[in-house]
């Protein structure tokens, strides 16, 4: 029913996902076991928080990505060898680049933009900051009030990603294994908890499935952990 009626939502509908589901009398199982986990996985946000996300924005995203139809789904393609392939291609075109060189500060003057990293000062005509907004704000030594308001208005939350080979994080039935596998039971953290199957997503041919699990490290066998990384995603409030 949701797939059938979702596109009839008006462009000026300002209801949240939770308000829409209640108003349109969708059952709790539909919201708790499908729509909220799906949105939570897409935006890496806990189900409690994502319930406040605008229903209009969700429907637009679902429509653009072919998620409102069970048939005629789009055929997704990916770059062979993953992002490393195009990162290396871009790097090959660059004159100079610095790796593992965190920017300490960016100061604007009438003559140049002064960038400081590793204690060294670099002068540029212009600097493009391609980071999260809170990181950009911390770099600027003299942010304007407008920059402080815009860059400081977005909150971020930490998500822990673990690369591992512990198949116990996947569904019991092998037939139910998908590229994205959401963990619903016992999720009291209000964080997105799911496991990505990288063998499906990136066509890996490894003997054991390479899995990436968000925010459930306590459920993973430590002996099967390969890498732990922490990411920060915007809070959709």
Kindly label every feature range from the protein language model:
Residues 102-236:
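Mid-domain catalytic core of redox enzymes
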Residues 2-107:
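Active-site/ligand-binding neighborhood in enzyme catalytic cores
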